[in-house]
Amino acid sequence: MNEKLPISIAQITDIHLLASESQRLQGISTTESFLAVMKRLEELRPELDLLLMTGDLSDDGTPESYENLQHYLNSLQIATYWLPGNHDCAIAMDKILNLGMVSRRKSFQRGNWNFILLNSSVTDCVYGYLSATTLDWLDSELKMLPNNPTLIALHHPPLSVNSAWIDRSCLQNSQELFAVIDRYPQVKLVLFGHIHQEFRRQRHNVHYLGSPSTCYQFQSQSTTFAINQELPGFRLLKLYADGTWTTKIERVPYSLPIEPTVTVSY
C-alpha cells in the first residue's frame, strides 16, 4: 500500500462535438453521448483531481463546438487540460478553452507526477506527426522538470493497433518520439486517443494506453472501417507518488442505436 494518496485522473477523448447540438454523427448525437459521460464524471467528481482531454474534442473545428464544450466543463469544476486532434482547430481551442478550471497549458505538475501534452495534429491531414520543434520541446521539458514519474499524452497512437485502416493514420514519426522517451526512464505512461477503443501495450518500461471514445467505437483488429455497439467510455487512472499506477475503463449507458451505414471518420 502506498503511503501517499494517488492522483486520480479521468481521460476523455474523441468527443466529436459539432457546431449544432442537434447534429448527428454516425447516427448518434455526440452531444448526448458526451453528456452521458459528463453525468458519470459528476458522480466521480469528489474523487477526481484532473481531467485530460486527448483530442478530437470537436468534429468540425468550429468555435461554436468549443464554446459548447467550455460551457459543459464549467459545471464540472475539475482541473482540465487538453490537446488537439486531427479534427480540431488548435487556434480556436487556444482562444476558447482557457477559462475557469480549463487550461491550455501543456506542461504541468500534480502531486509527484509531471504531465506533458503534445500536439500531433497536422493541418488537413488525418495522420499524426510530431514536428522537430515539438520533439525538441519535449526533450527540454524532460531535462528541466524534476526527475519524477512522467505522463505524456498526444492524440495519435505511436504504436500499431493491429487495425490496418487505423494504422495508416497513426503517428508517422514514432521512432523519433521513442528516441526522446528512451533517454528518460522517468517516463512511465503515454496516453492517446484517435482509435476509439481500449488499447494497452508496453514498450521497454513505458506503457502506452489508448482509450474509447465518448461517442462511437471502432471495431478492434478490423482491416476496414467498422463501428461496433460498445458503449461510450473513458479511462480512469490512479497515479502513485512512487511511479506505480492503476487504470480501468468506464462505460456509460447510451441507448440510441448507431446507423448501420456509415462513412469513414477518424
Curated annotation (Swiss-Prot):
Coiled coil: none
Binding, Fe cation 1: 14, 16, 56, 196
Catalytic reactions on record: a nucleoside 3',5'-cyclic phosphate + H2O = a nucleoside 5'-phosphate + H(+); 3',5'-cyclic AMP + H2O = AMP + H(+); 3',5'-cyclic GMP + H2O = GMP + H(+)
Entry binding sites for AMP: 16, 56, 86-87, 196
Binding site for Fe cation 2: 56, 86, 155, 194
Activity regulation field: Activated by iron and manganese.
Required cofactor(s): Fe(2+); Mn(2+)
Function summary: Hydrolyzes cAMP to 5'-AMP. Plays an important regulatory role in modulating the intracellular concentration of cAMP, thereby influencing cAMP-dependent processes. Can also hydrolyze cGMP.
Listed PANTHER family: CYCLIC NUCLEOTIDE PHOSPHODIESTERASE CBUA0032-RELATED, PHOSPHOHYDROLASE
Official protein name in the record: 3',5'-cyclic-nucleotide phosphodiesterase alr5338
Organism field: Nostoc sp. (strain PCC 7120 / SAG 25.82 / UTEX 2576)
